[in-house]
Design a protein with these regions (language model features):
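Right-hand nucleic-acid polymerase module
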Residues: 1-308, 320-614
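Short hydrophobic/aromatic beta-strand micro-patches
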Residues: 315-319
Length: 614
């Protein structure tokens, strides 16, 4: 009589399938760091079936779906920065060779789109084909796009698999922080090695000039606190009500729970998508408040939860405007809070804890101290780590070591913001800080006979060491108040438009050269600017990008898509005279810094002329 053969347990068969060539082929594109946790999650998916035709397809499809979302097509996620540079040169060469066979402009665009898709990046979005081709054949453009694409995909995978949380790697993964530190070191070496000379014969390195701007973290922190204190001064004078608001995302934006376990409701959204949700909700809220005649001004700060999901802290002051109709409701702040709750609870309103955690509001009691104290610690700890880092969940994030490299909490936050392109600090209401900085570049002789608002504003922005501090509140008064509309500003920027030749062809550059005062139509108070020329070439292929512009998240009646601005061949550096006693507190900008002629690319309408390889 034949004995019965004992059947192998299902879990053991699942584990043996991972050793087969079929599964190894699928997981070969996954970074080594992810494989163990990905296999564990694949086992959970396979657990309900013991038939090989089912559990094998489940495992393969799960890994394929994961790779499709977190591993860009045609990209090896394990490559380092040197490999990315080599890949960028290879991709640019492939585009140049492909364009040689292009039969028409449409055919050329299809070739570029196909190659961009193969490398998992977006095709350059420009109306003119020459602008698209100029970027697609430049290895530096490919390098920037690949760094961003690979970095964000790898970080999103770390969040999805539960590596980024308080008990593991808070705010950002260790690899992302180490990459950011390496990038900062490269930039610092390039800036220190590049020396500029102005028309007066004075020479400074770019690193020396950057130390005088808001790139210096202590200057940046000081300027932010100066502006916050100025808003508080205005609020106290006018009797405006103050509130401190913490706005968080719904639970499906969070990858990890407080205990470190995966959140089953997680929708695989990235921190950038979560921040876009907050931008949309607060924009709707601000528009609703404006329609009701409730004016708000203050600051908002974006911070990460322990699992990298953002939340916003906002110090806001509210007052009724001329459009406010319900004068019998004196508690304007209470009405504003109700509007905020309406939009904070709008998404997934019925989920447990929504009313408790989505929106936390504290009214500011002026008798208990300064309103700026509510937000000062968030400014300090997120710029240079002066304050202790505590997460929204109450955990304390301490400095840790990766090898011999110290990873501070503030460095993790900086990495998080840079990786996902999240703006950490934003002013709501008030006069623009750009005009404040431009006023500091104007000499006293220019305003001696100026109208009173101009003299008041100029005097408010000046700082003399040991004698006088700058006064943001007085600057707001001279401009018309804390909630003055942009079209009613007393002082505005004087801008100059000119066409420049950059790396990607001709573009229009808008540069401020002074300010206008509404009391003197047609008169420009010119600012002091220097012309800086490079004395030496500190880095091969170094690129200087224009700073990003202001962003307005509010809804508009006639939305217009902003025109894309290209990198210009010049950037501005401000006056830094040793004889001037006033410190600029970060306002060193000035003048035309041309890219070398070897880096200029004069675009032509035909494809053959754009590619040297043809």
């Amino acid at each position: 009589m034949r004995s019965k053969q004992r059947e192998m347990p299902a879990q053991r068969r699942h584990e043996l399938f991972f050793e087969t060539a079929k599964f190894k082929t699928e997981i070969a594109h996954i970074p080594y760091k992810w494989r163990k946790r990905l296999i564990a999650r694949t086992l959970d998916k396979m657990a309900w079936s013991s038939w090989h035709k089912i559990y094998e397809s489940i495992a393969v499809n799960f890994v394929r779906d994961f790779a499709k979302q977190y591993v860009p097509a045609g990209i090896n996620m394990t490559q380092d920065d040197n490999d990315i540079i080599a890949t960028a040169k290879k991709a640019a060469g492939q585009v140049s060779q492909g364009l040689c066979a292009a039969q028409s402009d449409q055919h050329a665009l299809l070739i570029i789109s196909a190659l961009c898709r193969d490398y998992g990046i977006d095709t350059p979005a420009f109306e003119e084909l020459a602008d698209v081709v100029a970027r697609a054949i430049d290895h530096r453009w490919w390098r920037r796009q690949l760094r961003k694409s690979i970095g964000r995909a790898f970080e999103a995978g770390n969040i999805r698999l539960g590596y980024v949380h308080y008990r593991g790697e808070p705010y950002a993964s260790n690899e992302a922080v180490l990459g950011r530190l390496a990038q900062n070191r490269r930039n610092a070496l390039a800036m220190a090695a590049t020396v500029l000379e102005n028309e007066n014969g004075e020479q400074f390195s770019i690193a020396d000039l950057a130390e005088k701007t808001t790139a210096n973290k202590s200057i940046r922190r000081g300027e932010l606190m100066l502006r916050i204190n100025g808003f508080e001064t205005i609020a106290r004078e006018t009797g405006d009500q103050g509130i401190f608001v913490t706005w968080t995302c719904p639970s499906h934006f969070h990858a990890t729970r407080r205990n470190g376990y995966a959140n089953p409701k997680y929708s695989h959204a990235t921190p950038r998508e979560a921040n876009q949700y907050l931008c949309k909700m607060t924009a709707l809220c601000r528009s609703a408040l404006a329609r009701l005649g409730i004016g708000i001004y203050g600051f908002r700060i974006a911070e990460p939860h322990h699992d990298s999901c953002p939340h916003w802290h906002m110090l806001l002051f509210v007052r009724p405007t001329e459009k406010y109709k319900k004068h019998h409701i004196h508690d304007v702040a209470g009405r504003a809070i109700r509007i905020m709750k309406r939009y904070a609870w709008r998404t997934e309103r019925g989920e447990p804890g929504a009313f408790e955690h989505r929106l936390d509001v504290k009214r500011i009691d002026w008798s208990k101290g300064s309103a700026a104290g509510y937000i000062a610690k968030y400014v300090a700890k997120n710029i240079d780590g002066v304050e202790q880092h505590k997460t929204r969940e109450g955990y304390t994030v301490a400095t840790d070591l990766n090898g011999d490299v110290e990873l501070t909490p503030s460095m993790r936050v900086e990495t998080w913001a840079a990786k996902w392109g999240i703006r950490q600090f934003q002013q709501w209401g008030g006069a623009p800080v750009t005009i404040w900085r431009e006023l500091r570049r104007i000499k006293k002789e220019m305003v001696n006979k100026a109208p009173e608002p101009m003299r008041r504003a100029w005097d408010a922005v000046q700082k003399i060491d040991g004698e006088k501090r700058a006064d943001w509140a007085e600057y707001l008064r001279a401009q018309g108040g804390a909630i003055v509309p942009r079209k009613e500003l007393v002082i505005t920027l004087a801008k100059d438009e000119k066409t420049v030749i950059g790396r990607y062809g001709e573009t229009i550059k808008v540069t401020p050269y002074g300010v206008h005062c509404s009391a003197l139509i047609g008169v420009v108070f010119k600012s002091v600017r220097h012309t800086w020329m490079p004395v030496n070439n500190g880095g091969d292929g170094a690129v200087f990008d224009l700073p990003r512009t202001r962003v307005n998240n509010c809804t508009h009646q006639n939305p217009e898509s902003p025109k894309t601005r290209l990198n210009s061949s010049t950037f501005d550096v401000n006056d830094q005279s040793e004889n001037n006693k006033r410190t600029t507190n970060g306002d060193i900008r000035g003048t035309n810094f041309p890219i070398s002629k070897n880096d200029q690319l004069k675009t032509q309408p035909r494809i053959k002329e754009l590619t040297n390889e043809c």
